[in-house]
Amino acid sequence: MREETYYSVRMRASRNAPHEQGGKHISGGERLITYSGLQEAVDGLLHKGFSHSRGIPDFMQIQLESINEPIETIRPLPVAFHQSDTPEKGQAIARKLLQKAGIPPHMIEKAYENIAEYAEARGAVLFDIRAGERIDGRGNRGVRVSRMDWPSHDFQKWAFTHNMPENSRIKEAHAIAAKVCAHPGIIAELCWSDDPDYITGYVAAKKLGYQRIAKMKNAGDESGCRIFFTDGSIDTESCIHFLEKQPVFIQREENI
């Protein structure tokens, strides 16, 4: 990594009130960037916050802080795509993939039984597959995977190689999945967006890579889900610290 100061720039946007006061989540995003790219990063996050299909926010916060610790480098995950023409078929594919990742079927069903509750969390939930319960203790806040980015030139080369669209949604989702799967105690992630216009979701796992599923909900549905399945061996606080605080670059090549 070059000896240059990087900054974490994070945006969150909501409507009717800030998130912690019960406001409706509209959008969020972040970048890891050097000083020369700050203006472009802030402009991009501002545009993202005001162009989301969940509505126009009346609260937005953009936060900047310098990164004063080494930035870890993580390789992108292998990628695959599964066609599904109904949410039911998409969710069935997700269940099969979670089982292939090593999660017992009865624990998959136990997590699914609580999805309506988990969907209320603004971030992810940690689900222990030994105890069969949520363990993060964060309530509606959840766990927010943060302080990661995928340098644009590197992402563009990856997208070209894998015949993937060069859009920010895939870049951001894959970056989150790669960071999550890099933690040794997390077996898999199950995710679909709360964006009513975006119906594609994914299962990500060390064993499987990043497995996109075409349709996991109906258009117009504003409910989303993000569950991290843990193996029961983790120290919860250190896991959350890694997910929220450890700066990470996703990088397929040797040099940023």
UniProtKB/Swiss-Prot annotation:
InterPro entries: BioW. Pathway: Metabolic intermediate metabolism; pimeloyl-CoA biosynthesis; pimeloyl-CoA from pimelate: step 1/1. Its EC number is 6.2.1.14. It catalyses: heptanedioate + ATP + CoA = 6-carboxyhexanoyl-CoA + AMP + diphosphate. Signal peptide: none annotated. It comes from the Bacteria. Keywords: ATP-binding, Biotin biosynthesis, Ligase, Magnesium, Nucleotide-binding. GO terms for biological process: biotin biosynthetic process. Belongs to the BioW family. Catalyzes the transformation of pimelate into pimeloyl-CoA with concomitant hydrolysis of ATP to AMP. Homodimer. This is 6-carboxyhexanoate--CoA ligase. The gene is bioW.
